Amino acid sequence: PRRSIGQQLNNPNDYRWSMRALLVAMNRWITDGAAPPSSRHPRIDDRTLVEIEALSFPQLTNVQKPTEAHKAYRVFYGLDFASKGIVSVDPPEANGSYPILVPQVDNDGNELAGVKMPEVSVPLATYTGWNLFNAESGPTSLLSSMQGSYIPLPRTRADRERTKDPRASIEER
């Protein structure tokens, strides 16, 4: 993986492998009436979707986890906006914000819910959907745009103990 505007290496996980299988399943659902695969998205009821303060990301040296996420505001553009796309209230009225929830992670820092790619099923790293800006690119407490992180696991138990990494090493798996 390469490094760009984020503090960590870029997440090399490629979603296209699962996309092909999902498109085949969707085609079977549409053409043959076959049941679609069950949903695997994070959910509040099973605690795989949590408030950012409840995120159990491992404490890793030189890895700063996000403490805030982009906030989505509830806005009102007028009565005709939803049905006709006509803006009659400009600027729009802000009516609060939506709750910010994030996917919960396992002991390696990989998301619990979702379609597990082979790299995540048998991990050699922590793969995140976020990467904070590095000092040369922006405020280091903010999420960089469209960048995930790749944080390699320690190779050996000795490496893990030397770096005080709480994740099991590759050797220990």
Label the predicted regions.
Residues 1-173:
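C-terminal His-loop and adjacent cap/lid subdomain of alpha/beta-hydrolase
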